[in-house]
Amino acid sequence: MINNLQLDSLVPGKRPEETTVVVAMSGGVDSSVVAVLLHKMGYKVIGATMQLYSSPNASSGKSCCGNADIYDAKKVAASFGFPHYVLNYEEVFRKEVIEDFVNSYKAGETPIPCIKCNQTVKFRDMLKMARTIGGDVVATGHYVRRLEVEGELQIWSGKDKNKDQSYFLFSMTLEQLKFVRFPLGNLVKGDVRKIAQYLNIEVADKPDSQDICFVPKNYKKTLASLDPSAIKKGKIHHIDGSVLGEHDGIANFTVGQRKGLGIAYPYPLYVVALDPVKNTVIVGPSSSLVKTQLFLRDLNWLSKDQIPEHGLSASVRLRSSSSAVQATISRSAKDGKGRVVLHEGCVVSPGQACVIYDNERLLGGGWILNQVRYSETA
């Protein structure tokens, strides 16, 4: 198991005892195993945990980066004798992640704050801190593979397909990738737990984090407390234009939703679109959910080979848990937005990430635009 770790020459030309590794420790089993193994192999390990959101109600036991997680990370570091620091990023997290979360829902989108956190706090601010204190590299517990192919750094899906986290890293830059290592990429979760148990790491049996750290139970209540203006009543329209009822705020709905509409109708209705300009929830039959085209903003590209003018054939994932589908990707020379033509119809949720792959290699991705809004401004 341990031989499968991506640990060969974390920094080419430097021995472990000459190499300072800042390990991003969440307090969970994955990053703890990374930190302890590197420490035992002779690397100069510095554990670092981000303090993102202080609230007695924020940590449900299934979220990350709460006070209990900080305590767990510090306890692991103390047990094995390497330094650990807590990084207070609450202010930047509030501005970059929480406010974006609220604004996305108000714009009729369904956001993914964990990717925003990776994009800003973790792989921007934390890497800057690591360089400041003399770190040679940063290591994390993500289940992805970092490969160098013909001199080009690439991200590939993790060996454990059930835990692969490449979807959440599409917004990384190549400059960041030079500085980051993913030692667990060739392992499966079960083996990582066995390593943790073998090494007597105290969090070996700790459950995986699942919830959003600042949304303990009910995101609707969280939205209302963060920004009451996000909850504004409006009309529910059928796709044929008829008014079917009222809603209590478009932020309470997401594309594809069926439950909670409060409308009696001859056939099941689903949310097919959200119009933030008109404050309207648009519903229709399940067949109206299926899309074959979508547009992307903030398209990030991780390959030296750019998207050709005639388009690129690749596979895309529209949710972290969804299977890949074939598509043709192109990029507007005018505004840089991505255009994705799906080879088969899918349910598309604005605000989610469309992540692009060449088999198991991560090529890049972008944020799915709300086509109701985009069509008005395009």
UniProtKB/Swiss-Prot annotation:
Disulfide bonds join C117-C213. GO terms for molecular function: ATP binding; tRNA binding; tRNA-uridine 2-sulfurtransferase activity. It catalyses: S-sulfanyl-L-cysteinyl-[protein] + uridine(34) in tRNA + AH2 + ATP = 2-thiouridine(34) in tRNA + L-cysteinyl-[protein] + A + AMP + diphosphate + H(+). Keywords: ATP-binding, Cytoplasm, Disulfide bond, Nucleotide-binding, RNA-binding, Transferase, tRNA processing, tRNA-binding. Gene3D superfamilies: Adenine nucleotide alpha hydrolases-like domains, HUPs, Translation factors. ATP binds at A24, M25, S26, G27, G28, V29, D30, S31, M50, G141. One of its GO terms (cellular component) is cytoplasm. It is found in: Cytoplasm. The record marks H142, Q352 as: Interaction with tRNA. Residues 163-165 are annotated as: Interaction with tRNA. Catalyzes the 2-thiolation of uridine at the wobble position (U34) of tRNA, leading to the formation of s(2)U34. Belongs to the MnmA/TRMU family. This is tRNA-specific 2-thiouridylase MnmA.
